[in-house]
A protein has these predicted regions:
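Glycine-rich anion-binding loops and their surrounding alpha/beta cores
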Residues: 1-128
Length: 128
């Protein structure tokens, strides 16, 4: 099973600013559909909010998302993560959005990210 995604605003991921066209490959067939973020109550403010030009600003965006701060970065991350959950769990996008939203609201994403940081720091120490 796979998704090929192209947002109408030119991003190579699902967008919160415009519709996203999807080709879903499943069981030797291809379904074509569009996702309108407004249908799921998702509205972006400005694409400029998610643009980044440095490692520091990228990290700031990551921390905004994992700390569950309402932002365009959180919304677009939620939508794209939900598409993956939908794909692998074979559930509806609405249900996947709910699962991903719960993970953000309960800080499970932040906790997992911090575990990853701890792990990589330990590996780095072990290698030295």
């Amino acid at each position: 099973r796979a998704l090929i995604i192209n947002s109408r605003d030119g991003m190579d991921e699902a967008s919160i600013y415009s519709q996203t066209d999807v080709l879903e490959i499943k069981n030797n067939s291809i379904d074509s559909y569009s996702i309108n973020p407004k249908d799921f109550g998702i509205r972006g403010n400005s694409i400029e909010e998610i643009k980044t030009n440095s490692e520091r600003s990228s990290l700031d965006i990551i921390y905004t998302v994992i700390n569950n701060i309402d932002s365009d970065a959180r919304k677009i991350s939620l939508l794209n993560a939900a598409l993956l959950v939908m794909l692998f769990k074979e559930i509806s996008l609405r249900d996947a959005l709910s699962e991903c939203n719960d993970a953000l609201e309960n800080y499970l994403v932040r906790d997992k990210f911090n575990q990853y940081i701890d792990f990589t720091n330990q590996v780095s120490k072990d290698v030295k």
